[in-house]
Amino acid sequence: MRKTIINSLLLLCCMLIIPYTAEGQIFTAVEVIDVKEAAIPMEFKANNAVKKVSISSKQQYIEVTKRGKTIRINPTPPPQASMYIWVSLSPNGKYILYNVPLRGTFVCTIKGKVVAELGRLNAPVWYDNNIILGMDDYDDGENFTKSDVVAVNFRTAQKQILSKETIAVYPYPEKPFVHYFSPNKLITIKLK
């Protein structure tokens, strides 16, 4: 038991230090296109464009349904994962993006093999088959105190901050555009 706890702590320490620290440039330009007055919605609807594979979060596993057959995968088993949130399928249907609270965001194959640990990246969404958008956010227990919208290439480990505001949350991709919220504003940027 003690060895398992020590190994878990070592893994957590390594995860906090090593993954996806490579700052880089994924896009050559980030251009602000539009700013509208808006409040942050309390609910967000998932984009279910992919029909051939469906994924849903259920307790401590992820369900993958393909061609009518459902399998359960547990890519980050307990004690590392208490639950899976923000589960989504890549546009090409080959990878699953998910978050484990207090552990970070991961990418795995549809068979459950983890291929990338992205670290701190909340509300992650696919921009394309390689790039993931998310929030690197901090709060005081009730409100965001700082938050950046970040793009991460899960294959190369490149990371780029896309927002210029102190608080930027809940990115939503609509290629080549990305929409996100800043206090009382909906901001649209164009990526090149």
Task: Give residue ranges: language-model regions.
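Beta-strand-rich domains and repeat architectures in extracellular enzymes and scaffolds
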Residues: 33-60, 81-85
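Short, solvent-exposed loop/turn segments at conserved positions within beta-propeller repeat blades
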Residues: 55-58, 99-102, 141-147
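A short beta-strand motif characteristic of beta-propeller blades
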Residues: 30-34, 69-78, 113-118, 158-163
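Acidic, small-residue rich beta-repeat scaffolds with periodic aromatic anchors
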Residues: 26-34, 140-192
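Bacterial N-terminal signal peptides
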Residues: 8-19
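Short loop/turn segments that connect beta-strands within beta-propeller blades
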Residues: 65-68, 109-113, 153-157, 192
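Short coil/turn segments at the loop-to-beta-strand junctions that recur within blades
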Residues: 35-40, 77-83, 118-125, 164-170
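Blade-terminus and WD-like Trp-Asp/Gly-His loop motifs, strongest in beta-propeller folds
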Residues: 43-49, 56, 87-95, 124-133, ...
